[in-house]
Amino acid sequence: MMKKRITQLLLICLLLPLCAGAFTSCEKQDETLTLYVYNWGEYISDGSDESVDVNAEFEKYCKEVHNMTVKVNYSTFASNESMYAKVSSGSTKYDVIIPSDYMIERMIKEDLLAPLDLEKIPNYAYIDDEFKGENVYYECNSEATYSIPYFYGMIGIIYNTSIVDENDEQIGSWDLMWDEQYKGDILQFNNSRDAFGTAQYKLGLDVNNEDEEQWRLALDELLEQKKIVQGYVMDEIFNKMQSGSAAIAAYYAGDYLSMYENNEDLAFFYPQEGTNSYIDAMCIPKNAVNKELAHYYINFMCSHDIAMANALYTYYASPVTTVVEDPEYRDEMGEYAIDILYNQADDVSSQAYLNLSPEALAMQNILWEELKAKSSIGNGIYIGCGVILGILALIGVYQLIRKRRWAKLYD
């Protein structure tokens, strides 16, 4: 059985030769600097299950190497869309964010990201060439570099072998997500791009096509599926699949491996019709306050030991070549996980999401709202909630008017 742990051989002293001397200009000894990091949930080694607490190690590194007192303020998001809404609003200024490829492309085009200074990220040398230069399809052919890969992977289908018949002909296909015999046991993504993607791949459509007719075909599939779906989820999937309260779900390969460790009845496949491949990468927002410190952090995350700690904890595929080649990493992960992350993935037809035009994004959002409005489920939100909220709003207005009238009577 795979283990989600790495021994405390990852001492901070091992990182010093990798990072010392790379930065000098922002050392501040008399104040506490706060680094605001915004990442996906369950996506970093956090000290649980005998793992390394990466953010605590970064704080220690800054103190021991640069004599800086640093506090990492770490928060998480559940979808690219929710992350984008918060970052683009400017309500909170983050220093490091970790979006997916298509969202990075959008944020570059909207001038929301700062170009990176690669001289301040010497550990970039450990990133596989597959994720550099012209291979970075989401950086708009820019001469500047806006992102450093964090993890990559593909979407597949998870199913519970104690509930789903192993001889089911739908295993291996997206059709399993639409199998009526598992009504009430199927989970769908609670984000528009991935949810529509499942239907588009099932139908053999181009996920980057902007033709409304094709998107409506996908909507029809999702509307049909909603009749048998238990719920629309993101991070909630961990508890539901591990506990056996749901039987089938499309999700990310790395997260499947994490769930598998807690429930060996779970199994996984990449759909034969094709699926989504993605890269999540570290970026610095243009309005970041601590850009220099953000470079420290990104460089730290690319160091061998920290990248390996994260890869072992999250079970995602690492873009750091020294990690993938490390015998300790491969042994700790086990053949099954390595096969899913690095071997099977090479044999599967996949397509990355690209940024859609503003018009297509608006269409996608309208169709997503249409799906949710016609569904009695969706992350615990029911159609009746809209009615209830409307009634509550009317009551609130009524009470406000009533209070004002009484106030006038006593004036």
Label each residue range with its predicted role.
Residues 344-411:
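Conserved C-terminal helix/tail region of periplasmic/extracytoplasmic solute-binding proteins
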Residues 103-106, 242, 248-265:
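A ligand-binding cleft/hinge motif common to bilobed small-molecule-binding domains
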Residues 38-52, 93-245:
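Extracytoplasmic ligand-binding site segments that recognize negatively charged/polar headgroups
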Residues 108-116, 141-144, 258-270, 331-337:
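Ligand-binding "clamshell"
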Residues 285-348:
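Mature extracytoplasmic/periplasmic domains
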Residues 22-25:
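C-terminal motif of bacterial Sec signal peptides marking the signal peptidase cleavage site
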Residues 215-224, 262-286:
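Periplasmic-binding protein-like
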Residues 27-106, 110, 239:
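Early extracytoplasmic/lumenal segment of secretory-pathway proteins
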